[in-house]
Regions:
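Conserved glycine-rich cofactor-binding loop
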Residues: 9-10
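Conserved glycine-rich Rossmann-like NAD(P)H-binding loop of the short-chain dehydrogenase/reductase
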Residues: 24-40
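Conserved mid-core segment of classical short-chain dehydrogenase/reductases
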Residues: 63, 67, 82-100, 123, ...
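Amphipathic alpha-helical dimer-interface segment in Rossmann-like NAD(P)H-dependent oxidoreductases
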Residues: 71, 105-124, 163-164, 216, ...
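Catalytic loop of short-chain dehydrogenase/reductase
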Residues: 83-84, 128-154, 159-168, 180
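Catalytic Tyr-X3-Lys loop
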Residues: 92-112, 126, 130, 155, ...
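C-terminal substrate-recognition "lid" of short-chain dehydrogenase/reductases
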Residues: 126, 205-232, 237-238
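Short, small/polar-rich loop/turn modules that mediate ligand/substrate recognition or access, typified
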Residues: 167, 172, 225-228
């Protein structure tokens, strides 16, 4: 089983690479941008892991991967990468260029990579797509996250279209909606971490390994599980 994970060198991406690499029958291909040392470490640590350079800010880099995908025979695609920062500023202070940049550096790569993988999946009449979203799209998102949540909401809706259009090809498209995780991507001050932990129902923050466990289970489920969303947020927001 060939699995492509975008953004796999750190945080949740790395946790998913390590979790899935423990299954010998899986061949993991993950993309990385700047973290070459981490990418090489993962390649050297697991015989069934392959790193591939990818920069969401570079269309040529995206196209190189897209052109390579037909030769990779991807059975499972995990869309995890996000270019940019989650936290921005209030909507009325947000420059329009922030929205267009987020679209060009996240939605366009998502579309191109997913379309390329769908081509092989349709031919073999099997495939699984897992899209990492955020629990912030449930109910009302926190202030200052308009660009990030709008981008993730776009992918969330595309996932619904994909599952509807390609279910007849035995292809599933599901979403995982994790809460905040203390990773480099979502780095905040120590006092903010303490506040979030104190306010959390379990008094502890979600860890990447916990989300990786859910993803590992999700890709084993029946093709009947299609168009489903899996919030991982200790019921802080309920769908």
């Amino acid at each position: 089983m060939n699995i492509l994970i975008t953004g796999g060198s750190s945080g949740l991406g790395r946790a998913m690479v390590e979790k899935l690499a423990s299954v010998e029958d899986y061949h993991i291909i993950f993309t990385y941008c700047h973290n070459i040392d981490a990418a090489k470490f993962l390649e050297n640590s697991y015989k069934n892991v392959q790193a591939y350079p990818l920069d969401y800010n570079d269309l040529d880099s995206i196209d190189r991967l897209v052109n390579e995908i037909p030769h990779l025979n991807i059975d499972i695609l995990i869309n995890n990468a996000y270019a940019g920062s989650a936290l921005g500023t209030h909507f009325h202070k947000t420059d329009i260029n922030d929205f267009t940049t987020a679209f060009n550096t996240n939605i366009i790569p998502f579309i191109k990579i997913t379309q390329a993988c769908l081509s092989y999946m349709r031919k073999q009449k099997f495939g699984k797509i897992v899209n990492i979203i955020t629990s912030y799209v449930i109910d009302v998102p926190p202030a200052g996250f308009s660009v990030y949540t709008a981008t993730k909401a776009y992918i969330r809706q595309l996932s619904k279209s994909i599952c509807k259009e390609y279910g007849r090809y035995n292809i599933t498209s599901n979403c995982v909606l994790p809460d905040y995780m203390p990773t480099a991507f979502g780095k905040v001050e120590d006092f903010q971490l303490e506040q979030m932990q104190a306010a959390h129902p379990l008094k502890k923050l979600l860890q990447p390994e916990e989300v990786a466990d859910v993803v590992a289970h999700l890709i084993l489920l029946s093709q009947q599980v299609n168009g489903v969303e899996f919030p991982i947020n200790a019921a802080q927001n309920i769908m």
